[in-house]
């Protein structure tokens, strides 16, 4: 029987969650320990847990034992609560704006994938984003769900019609399915993705996912190829009653290539808010398809090979993060660093891509205005 709830440490507290649900409940340390004991010894689900499940999610868990009903995640001394994982690089689309550049289908074998997920669980990862490439081409993430992780799957949606995927997501409901939308017409969609039939596959997948009641969100990707359809894309998402967000500012490839920047719609670019810091490398990390771990998707210098070093390799991430965030290179000594709009790793990518200064640096604003 699939578990109905997850009880987990989270930063300086504890949470009670329902797989696939946006709402959650904070619980006391005593309640967490009580659930932990009940699950270990096969005791009935505590009354407070049954009441919380009823109040928050409308669940009737009367008469259930804690074991099998709740996944109680163990405390971790590593301090990580979120992670992202490129399960593979392969993709059935060839999007012009993709930050991965080349996309060969490569990644870990099944046993090493399970080992990586075990490391993530033991490191404390509760929220896991699985991306690619196209992750639904390689749907080996049931173990992550069974380990009590809240999964976000980032997908192009083209395969969501497949019965095996629909069953997987219904049996193991994700926290969210984030689907990228590349146009509101066949012409623009197929042009940006560089694949004939991509629009039809996207529509087929979205229709099946909506009918299955999956927790969808649409990222409306606005580029030069589909800029004239930006409003129409958002309107379609609204018509489908799917939460949506416009994505307009592209970043260079992870190898420092500027190709994605050429795909941007200049009329739709947004000025970023000042960068106020983040927890990359401290409470969050990113794993590539071969379990090479970095502080995030952007700052990939000094990767740690988890298959070679194991979980203790993560103890070096904080030091790496602090070093990568230093204002070095062309940013060293900048008097405007307090209001800089990008982190140092992202600025480095822009510099390597020889991007126009105003696209990432305040010093370029006057240059662009003139």
Q: At which residue positions do the language-model features occur?
A:
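Residues at the N-termini of beta-strands
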Residues: 97, 127, 150, 176, ...
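Flexible, acidic/Gly-rich N-terminal and inter-domain linker regions that tether
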Residues: 1-81
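Short cysteine clusters
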Residues: 91, 95-98, 278, 296, ...
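Radical SAM enzyme [4Fe-4S]-AdoMet core and its adjacent flexible, acidic
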Residues: 1-10, 175-306
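Conserved alpha-helical substructure of the radical SAM core
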Residues: 46-48, 52-156, 160-167, 171-173
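C-terminal accessory region of radical SAM enzymes
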Residues: 36, 250-273, 292-350
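Iron-sulfur (Fe-S) cluster-binding segments and ferredoxin-like electron-carrier domains
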Residues: 100-108, 300-305, 337-369
